[in-house]
Amino acid sequence: MYGQVERKRVNFGKITNLDYLPNLIQIQKRSFDWFLQADVKDETKRRHQGLEAVFRETFPIESPNNDMIMEYSHYILGEPKRSPQECKDTDATFAMPLKAVIRLIIKETGEIREQTVYMGDLPVMTEQGTFIINGAERVVVSQLHRSPGIFFSYDMERDVFSARVIPYRGSWLEFEMDNKGILIAKIDRKKKFPATLLVKSLGHGTNEEVLRLFYSSKKEKIAGATSKDLKKILGRRTINDIINMETGEVMLEAGSKINEDNISILKEMKVKEVELIEFPKGKDNPILINALEKDGVNDYEDAILKFHSLMRQGEPSTIENATTELTRLFFSPKTFDLGEVGRYKINSKFEFNNPKEFSGEKARVLRPADIIETVRYILNLFSETENYYPDDIDHLGNRRIRSVGELISNQLKTGFSRVERVIKERMTVQEIETQTPQLLISIKPITAVINEFFGSSQLSQFMDQTNPLAELTHKRRLNALGPGGLSRDRAGMEVRDVHYSHYGRMCPIETPEGPNIGLILSMSSYARVNDYGFLETPYRTVKNGKVTGQIEHLTADKEEYHYIAQASGVIDEKGELKNKLISTRHRGDFPFRNPSEIQYMDLAPLQVVSVSTALIPFLEHDDANRALMGSNMQRQAVPLLREEAPFVGTGMETRAAYDSRICIVNKHDGVVTSVDAENIVVERKGGKESDTYQLTKFKKTNQGTCFNQKPIVGVVHSEINGKVSKVSKEKIEVTGENGELKEYVLQIGSKQYSPIVSAGEEVKRGSTLAGQVVVGEKLDEMGNILVKGTVLADGPAVDNGVLALGRNVLAAFMPWEGYNFEDAILISERIVRDDVFSSIHIEEFEIQARETKLGPEQITRDIPNLSDKAFRDLDETGVIRIGAEVKPGDILVGMVTPKGETDLTPEYKLLHSIFGEKAKDVRDSSLRMPNGFEGTVIDIKRFSRENQDELPAGVEEMVKVFVARKRKLLVGDKMAGRHGNKGVVARVMAEEDMPYMEDGTPLDIVLNPLGVPSRMNLGQIFETQLGFAASKLGISFETPVFDGAEESDVDNFCKEANLPLNSKFKLYDGRTGLPFMNEVFCGYIYILKLAHLVEDKIHARSTGPYSLVTQQPLGGKAQFGGQRLGEMEVWALEAYGASHTLQELLTIKSDDMLGRARIYEAIVKGIHSIKPGIPESFNVLVQELRGLALDIIITDSEGNTVDISDYEDEYSKSKKKIKFETIENA
């Protein structure tokens, strides 16, 4: 606004540079652009990825009898029918129509029938990286799953290695050693067979061929060898069969061990030399030879037939069938797909040892070479050969990200495969002459999978919109659960734990507490996802000990081989690393290295942590557990009525608010020409075009908080009527009608204004003289920000473009009369009175008028049997007026529903026949304000078929009522700082009774000092002290994570502000005026109000619903339930011998149906009597025992058998009056 000066900001960061931060919601937007390729100008030249790949993999489709073929040309995207805001208002999906150009070619005639076929509506991502599905904003969370490829693992308990080939789609192949020392293969975790059978089926038929494939050999002389030489070959194995030339008999099979008997036989046969296997490291390793003995075949044909009979038991085995089966399992693109990632992982695994076969390979199916190389690798692992290591399954090189685009295309593949089946069926059924692509294609399976994925998939989530940070974090979340991921129950400690490869890729701090810990994670602030779906983090390159300006992004795999210096390494003016030995990171270790041995250096200290953790000042002084709570609780902060940026921040606040896209950002350079509460108009440079930005006012978010945008740019208005006398870059002068001169300065702080009027122009009071100069946003092709645009309007929880989740309040750390015992908080009445922590909450109530069998429901003011008071705020149509104050039970929308004739009693029917009173054939089904809600009606939206609004089937009219309510801070509300220091308001104290400082300033909030030492979150102490200096000096501080203010910096600013270095002050008791015994630590701390408001939780039941089976009251506020009296409470009452109280609680106050009816009557009639009956849960128990075939007999006190069911029925049938024994008050 004009005339408003911004607070000066002091940044303590020495190395943190936020300019290198990627666009924080890039992961969502890039992935969806990859999928849709909407920006490609020529639709026929889209890349083979995402949606295009789905079409290309489904088509062409040939008819079963080969007489026609259906081909795909390209797809066309239409325009969305409604804007995102309209979709939210009408509960519609923000989607664009998808059409595809399909050709049907009749083979016999060569005729081509081409049509543009509508393939359904595809939900589209909004500017903010969200989807609007049925009017609700949703986010598709990225999934962290095990990457396709080949993995070698080591089982410590059994001391064996195993290999696993995991494809993107298709059969799993595993190799491992069984208990008998045989190398076995498993397909799809089911069929086990010797691994050599698979190798032989690939064309290496004999034992000798298999051995030569994996081992080298050496010839050793036998004829003429000395006994010493012959001793050396004892225990070695032959690589080939040794055959008696005369008889043709195999004397020694390939792989046989040579012993003394064999040597004498060989001498007898006059064998001159034998070829022996050279095992790695000379250790005999028989696992392959054991498998060769077990497989029992010695040529290719036998091997492949045996393989087929194992895989397809009971089917006739022919060479052709067997080859087809093997191809189907691993070598056919239709049934087996490694994906680009799987192939990339296999290549990178084997390239080092076999570059000829594996560098630059592109095949997405397995090749025989892949299987053979896998077997070779596992044999080398068993032989402990150098450069052969098992993989770490939790390493981020073996886990990848599936983002939105990939998740949607996987779903569409399922839909399209169903479509393919339908097309083939229809091709055979319909006549060729009449067939067209439109008639053959059914889009139902496609729309079904899209709706199912967006509506009910575990990864498509209702967006957390509590505040901008919650929204941003939700889009950057990584989820290891979901289809194809882990399950909560089976995930062990190792998967959940922090791994060294997470550094700079996934935040080690931000994860939920509870069963999902370590399974739901957040991306680190600088991390990005590469084309293969692996997380990368940026590093500055170091060459010959000198830090270059180059930045390289490394995946976890690539980082393995390098030594990386930390960002805080000391660098001189030339960019060279100063110290002789530098602390580096290498895999999970921290060795010291010379500068010449270092290849990379961290970019910034905060690259380790996520955005919300990077918002915690002095994070380095907090314990990790509390930092985790602090990160999570910032996401629960409610946007307040008056936002205030923190006095002590980290510098990340501006970027978090900007990238959350909750503010309005200017798109083109220009000048603001007009500003009001709903629109901002910016005239572009050159003055030919102007852009109008519409502000969102008081809309409900998913969590019921208030979304409201406020302009922060301005124009200069004339304050007088007169004439512009002078215009320059610095100022505008206006001479008034009475000759007075008014000056308007055009540079205020960082804001520059540009004149819109010229000298000599007549101006009226309120005329626009100048507009603020604004910068347009510029992005690169990756979506990263090159130039930040000017923020035109703040969103919720944003103050002047800076994220502002809470308020700065004057706090003291001292115990006060026990009101802050155990994390409770004592606050001043001023905070409530001045609306410091007040927030606006909006609730939406909806009613639909439907067409019923008995006639339509009607929204009307004419409701039977109600007093005039109930209608006082309804308009003539029966809808409440905007501005009305509503309380529980008030009518929001009047509606009547036709009543069925069956409902009428005989007396009513008689009245009808006499008076013909048909008007009362309706019952009241109005929308009323539910219990526990009150507020002011701020908006009403009406939709009806008459106005051509789209409504669900059977709905004639729909009304939505929005009720807003200002919530002040109450006792019981949860509040928290940014360091995991949470508590509940215990008392709101009169301002004059609060402790006050020597100058008479009363405190706003009193916290318990005992909450600090055991929790080790000292960040709050530093923040409080620096906050006081900021308040006194009128500036704001930025102290970046791990690169912030040191103690000396804090001390220097305290001196400047004339504050004591220990920040301790003499305080006086507000009630007595006497000073407290000790000085107290005081300062300004940033406190948030969390979304756990006491009003939403407090609840009391009068009369409510009962469970159908047990007849006990339901539980929970939503069901208007009762308070559970559990077994421990029963024990407590038993311990006190309170038998009557206990009996009453277990029977008439709970599930004794007869007793409930009686007690009601007794209360109405004023009779002081209670006679408990049998609780319904006892009947349920009896029936359950009878269900177990146990005959249960119940007897009364006199030994007579009581039939419970009769006992009840008698009561309900006769409805006889119950006699009450009146107890006289003697």
UniProtKB/Swiss-Prot annotation:
It catalyses: RNA(n) + a ribonucleoside 5'-triphosphate = RNA(n+1) + diphosphate. One of its GO terms (cellular component) is DNA-directed RNA polymerase complex. The lineage of its organism: Bacteria, Pseudomonadati, Spirochaetota, Spirochaetia, Leptospirales. Keywords: DNA-directed RNA polymerase, Nucleotidyltransferase, Transcription, Transferase. The RNAP catalytic core consists of 2 alpha, 1 beta, 1 beta' and 1 omega subunit. When a sigma factor is associated with the core the holoenzyme is formed, which can initiate transcription. GO terms for biological process: DNA-templated transcription. It comes from the Bacteria. DNA-dependent RNA polymerase catalyzes the transcription of DNA into RNA using the four ribonucleoside triphosphates as substrates. Belongs to the RNA polymerase beta chain family. GO terms for molecular function: DNA binding; DNA-directed RNA polymerase activity; ribonucleoside binding. This is DNA-directed RNA polymerase subunit beta. Its EC number is 2.7.7.6.
